[in-house]
Amino acid sequence: MDTEQVMDLGSALASMGQVALGHCGGAGAEALALAAAAGVTAAGGWVIRHDGATPAAANWLCDYYGLSGGLFLEQQGEQLTLYPITAGGQPLEREAQRKLENDLLRRNFRRPPAAEMGGESQLASVMESYLAAAVHSAGAAGSYPCTLAVEPGQTLLKQGLRWLGCQLAERDVVGVPAMALASGGRELLIWTEDGERRSREEVLLLTCAALLDSGQRSLYLPPEAPAAIERLARDRGGTVQRMESGVPTGCQRSLRDGLFAACQIVCYVQRTGETLSQLFQRLPGCQVRRRVVPLRTSRSAVMGALSRQYPDAQRMKQGMRLDLEDGSVWIAPANDREALRVVTEGARAETALELCDFITNEAGKWDAL
């Protein structure tokens, strides 16, 4: 996006009222953040500038302070990524994305007189507050020692682990598990003692196990979260709430934030005295396959046909979940084209792949009619 387009984006976001604005990575992101701020104030909105240095910290800020939304600009070399944020620190849902795209296309912005234009204020020390919130959210730590390696350049993660009393080792030490933050801090990567990198679903399952162990009995998850979490919660006396309209404000940030998840898991290790490998072994099997299925007809027509074919499927605003004998299937329309997003899950990789092939074929049959 060029400067004028980013300014228009700021004007479109001004309908939120207050827009938290942050950036990281270089002069390009900083310059475009200025353009976005100008767009917000020109449309009568109020800009809250902050020094949060990651998209995850910006999400936490909106959640913690109850802000109506925000925008974070991340620059990595020549690539610039924009992260619009809604209330509660949530990413934009599909309907909100469509409205925003429509407003940008039509340039449907408010342009008040000078006396009614917006303004801005500042929030400082966001990263320090974000780190403290992540550490304190993990609850009580146990007395067992925990040693971890951290990927180079992960200063924030190192600070959080040290705060919890975790011993840090060099990354290449044999037999020492490792962690890293990815996707702008929103995802946690884990390598166990044998050097195996665990899947995103396994890390999510371990985070849920840590929350249940800390005393929480309800897990608040998006509709597409793995069905294996329901088995985990049932076995440990908990329940799963699939939230169609976002997770409640301030609730279980460790399920969508890498730093919060790392702190939660470290305290879990300190309470149990088990290794990460042992904790992963006690989780239900969860192998996932993802596929985008292109369509010649419309997404809604094929989704409707699949819904009629499987009347017992759980229909939700974002898609539908189908529980079969060997696993589960999540089907949702793609946001940017005539296609379906299919996510299949089974205890074994072979099962997940077979389910993925099966649903792809079923969708293809309806698409051919």
Identify the meaning behind each predicted range.
Residues 1-9, 79-177:
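Gly/Ser/Thr-enriched, mixed-charge loops and adjacent short helices
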Residues 4-82, 160-197:
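N-terminal small/polar loop signature for handling phosphorylated ligands or for N-terminal nucleophile
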Residues 9, 36, 58-61, 157, ...:
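Buried hydrophobic packing segments
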Residues 9-16, 114-118, 206-215:
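Short, basic/hydrophobic alpha-helical segments
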Residues 17-26, 144-151, 217-223:
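Short glycine-rich phosphate-binding loop at a beta-alpha junction
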Residues 52-53, 152, 203, 223-225:
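Short beta->alpha linker loops
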Residues 95, 99, 104, 126, ...:
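Hydrophobic/basic alpha-helical segments enriched in Actinobacteria
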Residues 183-186, 193-196, 200, 206-207, ...:
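Phosphate-binding and adjacent anionic-ligand microenvironments
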